[in-house]
From Swiss-Prot:
The gene is rplK. The lineage of its organism: Bacteria, Bacillati, Bacillota, Bacilli, Lactobacillales. It comes from the Bacteria. This is Large ribosomal subunit protein uL11. Belongs to the universal ribosomal protein uL11 family. Keywords: Methylation, Ribonucleoprotein, Ribosomal protein, RNA-binding, rRNA-binding. Pfam families: Ribosomal_L11 (PF00298), Ribosomal_L11_N (PF03946).
Length: 140
């Protein structure tokens, strides 16, 4: 018989840098997960993606065991990396902070395709372009 899922915890953690300190420790402690076990496994799985923020969905079972799925980094993080900026614009409609090419947007859309509910790459590109617009990044 399959184990019953007791709780689902969603976090966004920098790749390879999960530590028992807040915010990871308290969130996992409340769910009853072995914090050190999770941090070691997460860091090992995401070591090759250093510098990116990785969303993770942790399923906690009745017997306190857990499994987790890592997702692709948020579009905003990938756009900031592509545009080589620290943060988006405070006033996206007035001040533009950077530009990205449509090729870069397509690359990000293809990477994010698994996590987006888009029918094709074109729709995914429109979603990524919308995120860029809301950050004050111009898509050329």
């Amino acid at each position: 018989m399959a184990k019953k899922v007791e709780k689902i915890v969603k976090l966004q953690i920098p790749a390879g840098k999960a530590t028992p300190a807040p915010p990871v420790g308290p969130a996992l402690g409340q769910a009853g997960i072995n914090i050190m076990g999770f941090t070691k496994e997460f860091n090992a799985r995401t070591a090759d993606q250093a510098g990116l923020i990785i969303p993770v969905v942790i399923s906690v079972y009745e017997d306190r065991s857990f499994t987790f799925i890592t997702k692709t980094p948020p579009a905003a993080v990938l756009l900031k990396k592509a545009a080589k900026i620290e943060k988006g614009s405070g006033e996206p409609n007035k001040t533009k902070v950077a530009t990205v090419s449509s090729d870069q947007v397509k690359e990000i859309a293809e990477l994010k395709m698994a996590d987006l509910n888009a029918a094709d790459v074109e729709a995914a590109m429109r979603m990524v372009a919308g995120t860029a617009r809301s950050m004050g990044i111009i898509v050329e």
